[in-house]
């Protein structure tokens, strides 16, 4: 007997780009994918990559939160949020979905639920490495608490853009970036807290390990079955 659920499960394209992808190239790639999703010529997609050292400004970014505009290339991202750093050792996952349809626990046309579920995806991914990620009601992203000092540091950022209910941009999880590079901005406009990474917490995992954890935790939340991770 065939499993009817297996026959009707929706898949989503997952792929990863080797090397460092310049930020403008990523924007162009997402714009092309989003246009295809809208007209039915391209599938929904999760795109895994790293950027060269880059500062990006969300729609709420303030000039005074960028300390050295000439330190790294700086781009207006068009996504929600404030200043973000991207660089080697940080796993960026760009998620492109048609939100006019439900996706797992995310109802159709519910942006708040979508953002909440992106955070939950990161929290479940971190749990696979014995790291407790937490939400904060007044701060978007995922946070960890230093058991020794009680300090809260950000380990993952997220920012999304929605165009006619097709979403793009996504999440950035700090695996092993140079944390000093964050010093050129006030990350996400939050001065009271710092940033951390899996390596800084003592978990010497690879980007590949993180990719598999992201993929393993996807389906229960978003409903679709990830394809094997291919090369973009």
UniProtKB/Swiss-Prot annotation:
An example Gene Ontology molecular-function term: lipoyl(octanoyl) transferase activity
Top-level EC class: transferase
Active site: 188 (acyl-thioester intermediate)
Domain BPL/LPL catalytic: 40-226
Pathway: Protein modification; protein lipoylation via endogenous pathway; protein N(6)-(lipoyl)lysine from octanoyl-[acyl-carrier-protein]: step 1/2
Similarity field: Belongs to the LipB family.
PANTHER family (alphabetical): LIPOYLTRANSFERASE 2, MITOCHONDRIAL-RELATED, OCTANOYLTRANSFERASE
Function: Catalyzes the transfer of endogenously produced octanoic acid from octanoyl-acyl-carrier-protein onto the lipoyl domains of lipoate-dependent enzymes. Lipoyl-ACP can also act as a substrate although octanoyl-ACP is likely to be the physiological substrate.
Miscellaneous information on this protein: In the reaction, the free carboxyl group of octanoic acid is attached via an amide linkage to the epsilon-amino group of a specific lysine residue of lipoyl domains of lipoate-dependent enzymes.
NCBIfam families from the UniProt entry: lipB, PRK14341.1, PRK14345.1
Name assigned to this protein: Octanoyltransferase
UniProt source species: Gluconacetobacter diazotrophicus (strain ATCC 49037 / DSM 5601 / CCUG 37298 / CIP 103539 / LMG 7603 / PAl5)
The organism's taxonomic lineage, starting at the top: Bacteria, Pseudomonadati, Pseudomonadota, Alphaproteobacteria, Acetobacterales
């Amino acid at each position: 007997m065939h499993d009817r659920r297996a026959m009707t499960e929706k898949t989503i394209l997952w792929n990863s780009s080797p090397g460092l992808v310049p930020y403008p190239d990523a924007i162009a790639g997402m714009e092309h994918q989003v246009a295809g999703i809208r007209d039915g010529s391209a599938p929904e997609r999760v795109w895994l990559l790293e950027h060269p050292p880059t500062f990006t400004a969300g729609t709420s970014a303030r000039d005074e939160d960028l300390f050295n505009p000439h330190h790294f290339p700086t781009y207006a991202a068009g996504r929600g949020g404030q200043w973000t750093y991207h660089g080697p050792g940080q796993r960026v996952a760009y998620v492109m979905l048609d939100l006019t349809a439900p996706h797992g626990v995310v109802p159709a046309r519910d942006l708040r639920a979508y953002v909440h579920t992106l955070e939950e995806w990161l929290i479940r991914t971190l749990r696979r490495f014995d790291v407790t990620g937490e939400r904060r009601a007044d701060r978007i992203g995922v946070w960890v608490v230093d058991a020794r000092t009680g300090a809260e540091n950000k380990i993952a950022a997220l920012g999304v853009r929605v165009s006619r209910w097709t979403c793009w941009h996504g999440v950035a999880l700090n695996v092993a970036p140079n944390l000093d590079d964050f010093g050129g901005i006030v990350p996400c406009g939050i001065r009271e807290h710092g940033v951390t990474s899996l390596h800084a917490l003592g978990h010497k995992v690879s980007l590949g390990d993180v990719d598999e954890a992201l993929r393993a935790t996807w389906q229960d939340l978003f409903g679709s079955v990830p394809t094997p991770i291919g090369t973009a």
